[in-house]
């Protein structure tokens, strides 16, 4: 043990780091010293609430998956239950083949079960190919190896055609991962589909992508019917915070009561001299200070986490440091008028549409608490893995691109009263083929090193609930090691 109070250093003041700090405080008590270090000058990481003249808006993640009851329960345990709000229920749309169309309901993250509802969004030939894919007399069954992982875009294109990738799968996944489907692995991004393909193979059924998608949809429908039959209230698809995610990260800081070291990074982690096997680490900060820590939780981006593990866990260092990152930008615009803005929650943009934006969220339509303020709030999203050209544009250029695309899609051409441009450099990890296996190898290596854990959006999922779960697991690991 280090001299003085039990000390845990948390590298990263984003959601993962703050939740880990909160869990550590609950487990270790008020006497523990918890030090949260972050090179940024603010807490929250990729969650960022900014103030406008009409109230707070989000320029990072906007919402979380409402069916993740564990996340909602956690927020309520923090005393934030009254802050949670639900969307309006207005439909979302997709722009493809030159038109804005209703979002199809018979797909699994864009992978269709049939051509129903896809006419116009896709060509007649592609619709016919979708309907033939599950018929062994027209299309050879899919060769699937149980437990295997494949490139999502390549799989969908090989079975259903390029249009399905560009008009459905890439737009739906682009907002989550800032990647085209061609840059993602199936098992990490659409796990239910991969598991269903495994199940079909295990019992010797003819395997097809559309049949697997239909089975996933059927399972979801059955689960929903069971919930309704039990009297349970159906969970909204999304939830967010009335006053922004700032409510969450400020509350976590207040209740975890860590020492905040903002504007300073962690440069190196090494086993403390004379502390072999004890788990005690020397944590060198970017300003030259060295903190003696009984445990360390790494809640930083993958390249940073990988570099910091170099001396204490080389195997995990190499794996985690190899996770690629995608950059993106959000252009949040507040308008004094809503006249002419369509009555839906937003538009996803097909990958081959020829526009700069990949999506628009009509936040004031989607969220009643924002609509109550009057005027309109619209968020444009830009940037994909492997292409930072749009993210590198100036604020004025990005704003002009957002306004031009918004006008092209909707005809809405009001002058924004306020604009906030937020760039997320390397903000979203890429979930490539084999990502899950690599993370299991990294976890196994880290499990052999006492009093250190790593978590974050690069690990088990980029969404808010996934980061919550990951942070809790990381905190529990070091607490168990300290016991």
Task: Identify the role of each PLM range.
Residues 2-16:
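Beta1/beta-strand and adjacent pyrophosphate-binding region of the FAD-binding site
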Residues 16, 42, 303:
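Conserved Rossmann-like nucleotide-cofactor binding loop
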Residues 25-51:
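Glycine-rich FAD pyrophosphate-binding loop
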Residues 53-144:
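Dinucleotide-binding Rossmann-like beta1-alpha1 core, especially the glycine-rich loop
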Residues 73-105, 160-165, 255-262, 267-280:
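Feature captures the FAD/FMN-dependent oxidoreductase FAD-binding
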Residues 104-112, 360-483:
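Conserved flavin/dinucleotide-binding core of flavoenzymes
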Residues 134-268:
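Active-site/ligand-binding neighborhood in enzyme catalytic cores
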Residues 265-378, 383-392, 396, 408-409, ...:
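Mid-domain catalytic core of redox enzymes
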């Amino acid at each position: 043990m280090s001299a003085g109070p039990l000390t845990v250093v948390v590298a990263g003041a984003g959601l993962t780091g703050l939740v880990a700090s909160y869990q550590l405080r609950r487990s270790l008590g008020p006497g523990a010293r918890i030090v949260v270090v972050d090179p940024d000058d603010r807490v929250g990481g990729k969650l960022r609430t900014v103030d406008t003249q009409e109230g707070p808006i989000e320029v990072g993640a906007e919402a979380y998956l409402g069916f993740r009851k564990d996340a909602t329960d956690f927020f309520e345990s923090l005393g934030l239950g009254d802050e949670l709000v639900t969307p309006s229920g207005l439909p979302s749309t997709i722009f493809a083949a030159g038109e804005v169309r209703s979002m199809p309901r018979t797909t699994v993250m864009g992978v269709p079960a049939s051509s129903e509802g896809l006419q116009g969004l896709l060509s007649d030939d592609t619709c016919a190919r979708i309907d033939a894919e599950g018929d062994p007399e027209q299309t050879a069954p899919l060769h699937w190896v149980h437990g295997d992982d494949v490139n999502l875009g390549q799989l969908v294109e090989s079975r259903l055609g390029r249009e399905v990738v560009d008009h459905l799968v890439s737009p739906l996944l682009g907002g989550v991962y800032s990647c085209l489907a061609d840059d993602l692995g199936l098992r990490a991004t659409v796990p239910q589909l991969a598991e269903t393909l495994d199940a079909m193979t295990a019992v010797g059924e003819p395997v097809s992508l559309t049949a697997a998608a239909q089975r996933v949809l059927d399972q979801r429908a059955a689960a929903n019917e069971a919930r309704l039959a039990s009297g349970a209230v159906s969970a909204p698809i999304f939830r967010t915070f009335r006053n922004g995610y700032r409510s969450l990260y400020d509350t976590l800081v207040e209740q975890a009561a860590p020492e905040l070291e903002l504007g300073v990074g962690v440069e190196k982690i090494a086993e403390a001299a004379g502390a072999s096997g004890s788990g005690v680490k020397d944590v060198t900060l970017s300003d030259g200070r060295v903190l003696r820590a009984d445990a360390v939780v790494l809640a930083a981006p993958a390249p940073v986490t990988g570099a910091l593990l170099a001396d204490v866990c080389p195997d995990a260092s190499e794996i985690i440091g190899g996770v690629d990152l995608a950059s993106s930008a959000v252009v949040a615009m507040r308008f004094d008028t809503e006249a002419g803005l369509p009555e839906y929650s937003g538009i996803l943009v097909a990958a081959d549409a020829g526009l700069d934006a990949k999506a628009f969220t009509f936040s004031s339509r989607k969220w009643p608490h924002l609509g109550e303020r009057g005027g309109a709030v619209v968020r444009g999203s830009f940037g994909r893995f492997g292409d930072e050209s749009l993210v590198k544009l100036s604020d004025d250029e990005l704003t002009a691109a957002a306004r031009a695309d918004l006008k092209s899609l909707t005809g809405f051409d009001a002058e924004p009263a306020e604009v906030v441009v937020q760039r997320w450099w390397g903000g979203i990890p890429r979930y490539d083929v084999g990502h899950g296996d690599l993370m299991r190898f990294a976890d196994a290596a880290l499990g052999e090193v006492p009093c250190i854990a790593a978590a974050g959006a690069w690990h088990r999922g980029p969404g808010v609930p996934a980061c919550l779960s990951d942070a809790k697991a990381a905190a529990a690991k070091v607490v168990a090691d300290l016991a």
